[in-house]
Amino acid sequence: RDFTPREEKTGDVKQSIAERAREMADKGMRDNPYRNLTREESDRRAAAGEPFAIRLKVPETGKTSFEDKVYGLQERDYKDIEDLVLLRSDGHPLYNLAVVCDDIEMGITHVIRGQDHLTNTHKQILIYQALGAKVPEFAHLPLILAPNKGKLSKRKHGEIVSLTTYRDAGFLPEAFRNFLALLGWSAGEEREIYSMEELIEKFTLEGIHRSNAIVNFREGDPKHWTDDKAIWMNAEYIRTMPIADLLPYVKAELKSAKLWREEYAESEREWFEHTIDIIRARFFTLKDFSSQGRAYFSEDYDFDPAAIEKNLKKFP
């Protein structure tokens, strides 16, 4: 038990604790004055009503190690791991204890997560061992970063990280899934287009990259609002996927733009399918069918001023 009253620390006390921690770290010692408190003394003080937290007593010598399925052997000296708090004074568990207990309860055999959790893994292995539970296999994945090499997050980057943004911008689920899969993994082949079935068949932990992936976009630039590779891949899917698979997406887009006519599914079906098959080669997103392709489905459309200048005014 740690009897430091965490909820009542003043600024002076916090500063004193921080200074003590630095001094002890310089000496290779742990910042835990209650580490060697006897069980009797600990029980007595707890019974007397002193607030306390429960810590894990980490060995002073030796090291923890595990074979990560992506990054290989990972080792950390015990002296570099603090006597981590497991339970607060109010009895609530902290993150590391909670996730270990959850995984044990659910029978988790493989933990696959971002590489920013590598330091937590060493702590969690100690908790598994203390509880006498089998340690699962660990695989840590590279992170997805912004162009400035910072971690992508909803707080910092807003809509760029939202799946609904890509859906509303006219991305096909199949294409975006393919793009995401290749951000941190490779099948070791000279190809980039994979169906869901192929991704499942070819995926291995060994194919995961160790380096972080970067999504290249320019904030405030409508033309480059997301990675060019994502847009290219979406266009590739639009151009090459079976027309029967593409038509439902086009129908939904035309309905959204109030350009859909039921005749396209009945008496004009052959014309509609043939038209979509021709014009899709020029488009990058589903939105292009209702914008650039509007003239095929409506008499009400605008002419591109640049096209008028280039093509029509030549021939008055």
Where in this protein do the model-derived segments appear?
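Residues that cap or delimit alpha-helices
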Residues: T38-E41, P242-D245, P316
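Short, intrinsically disordered, charge-balanced linker/junction segments flanking boundaries
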Residues: A307-P316
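Active-site cores that bind ATP or allylic diphosphates and position pyrophosphate for catalysis
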Residues: D2-K156, S162-L163
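Catalytic adenosine-cofactor/nucleotide-binding cores of aminoacyl-tRNA synthetases and other
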Residues: L131-F303
